[in-house]
Regions:
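C-terminal and late-domain segments of enzyme folds
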Residues: 1-167
Length: 167
């Protein structure tokens, strides 16, 4: 129910589901582990009407979010909406990573963790018990916007860091 319209170096998201932008340009991996792992990825969630410049990575919120609340968790006097964020048991489930990012942004916490695994593995798969722990954490440029003006909670979240560790 959403799309990312790309025109040159500009992206605009349309639709209520939003889009997750994954920036791996500064990420690293440890090849010696022999399985997927990642350190230092960046995630941004863009909602309906939000824009992203692919060259500068500058995120511009939609007009209704720009008119709402700007959230900078490092700002003096920051008053978080959430006091806690749960450990997410199915972090790649429908909407789970976006909720985790929003809760992290608008809380005093520095990080949120969650698990991802495939319960439908083949019995002879040597990595059948392998899953991943995703660690989402605030970076120096993690900020966001919030608006409830259109009848539902709507967050735009910029530059949450991501580490993925095999478990």
């Amino acid at each position: 129910n959403s799309a990312a319209i790309i025109s040159g170096h500009a992206v605009e998201v349309i639709g209520p589901g939003g889009a997750l932008f994954v920036d791996l340009s500064g990420a690293t991996t440890d090849r010696s582990l022999g399985v997927f792992n990642l350190q230092g990825g960046q995630l941004s969630f863009l909602g309906d009407g939000d824009r992203l410049d692919l060259r500068t990575r500058r995120l511009t919120p939609s007009a209704h979010k720009a008119a709402g609340a700007f959230i900078d968790p490092r700002a003096p006097g920051f008053r978080p909406e959430y006091t806690d964020a749960p450990f997410v048991l199915d972090v790649l489930g429908d909407g789970a990573i976006v909720r985790a990012m929003s809760n992290l942004l608008d809380s005093p916490l520095d990080e949120v963790r969650g698990l991802a695994f495939d319960a439908r593995f083949a019995p002879d798969d040597p990595q059948r018990a392998l899953g991943s722990e995703l660690r989402l954490y605030k970076g120096p440029d993690t900020v966001g916007w919030y608006s409830g003006s259109q009848g539902e909670e709507a967050y735009t979240v910029a530059s949450v860091r991501l580490d993925v560790t095999p478990v």
